[in-house]
Amino acid sequence: MVKLLNSTRELSINALSMLNSFGDMVAQATGLNRKLLTTDSSDATARRLLQISNAKPNATVALDGSGQYKTIKEALDAVPKKNTEPFIIFIKAGVYKEYIDIPKSMTNVVLIGEGPTKTKITGNKSVKDGPSTFHTTTVGVNGANFVAKNIGFENTAGPEKEQAVALRVSADKAIIYNCQIDGYQDTLYVHTYRQFYRDCTITGTVDFIFGNGEAVLQNCKVIVRKPAQNQSCMVTAQGRTEPIQKGAIVLQNCEIKPDTDYFSLSPPSKTYLGRPWKEYSRTIIMQSYIDKFIEPEGWAPWNITNFGRDTSYYAEYQNRGPGAALDKRITWKGFQKGFTGEAAQKFTAGVYINNDENWLQKANVPYEAGMMKV
């Protein structure tokens, strides 16, 4: 399926250079320091990308009317059909109360804000209100080669409202950079296809990073919020249904920590790294900081059953922090006790999602292909 989509989904190097240049302009305007990480600093393509300048947004959105559009939806309506180059939408600071759905036919959309806490897209739909989890999302992305930078995505439904998605990504080669993704249960839906998250903050309570995409999160802050009373928290809930599927959630050099008011509940909540949403659930946490609030077992069963215990795939490698000790971890068959550096390498961004296409290098975002120096 991926090969069939490549011809319509591949961004040109020149177009991505425009994206990089404009991204640098926004970073300078917001005071963000952008550090480039590539596999080869002498790479000729990277040098050419850095030389392109003077990119301008195709559309500007501002609540106060100072842009071409007042809503993000209006700007998206201006994206040409069968778009083959980045269509850059600059969204000025403000709280945008909109529900956004970028269709599969709308490819190469680039959303750039003025900061992850300054430009915010917010909603509050939840399954308690009637829609399915898939349709609770504040922002849903289906078009390939999507990029978001310096934006906040939010679902404010609250811990009692059950599933309520802030951002759903169902697009191949999606990049989310320096964004804040806030919610409670089911905050970030890494639904399907290849996706890369860098320098983001994701907050939530139950299963708040979930789905069956090929998702790599690098240098992200994963913050567990105060849940509802008597509610246990689960960082991940990966959804692989067959062993041949490529889906996995990979956290590399991330920080897993509690929010400031997490411990205010009495009795205190229990938090786990994840649980098997589907039978062949697969999650790898490596080179990350795990705080002491994570239960020693590390991983939890699905609703106190044996579901997925033998067929899931949970691995931890080179983690640090008081919650990273492996001596009391679960003894399920699905827990990879002898997980090696060679096995971990297969889930690095350069191997797992970038492979021979080098789409991450072409996008010129901060990116580490292999194991990181931590």
From Swiss-Prot:
Keyword Secreted applies: yes
GO biological process: cell wall modification; pectin catabolic process
InterPro entries: Pectin_lyas_fold, Pectin_lyase_fold/virulence, Pectinesterase_Asp_AS, Pectinesterase_cat, Pectinesterase_Tyr_AS
Record protein name field: Pectinesterase
Pfam families, A to Z: Pectinesterase (PF01095)
A GO MF term: pectinesterase activity
Tissue: Pollen, and at much lower levels in pistils and petals.
PROSITE patterns recorded: PECTINESTERASE_1, PECTINESTERASE_2
Sugar-modified residues: N58, N124, N230, N303
S-S pairs: C200-C220
Species of provenance: Petunia integrifolia (Violet-flowered petunia)
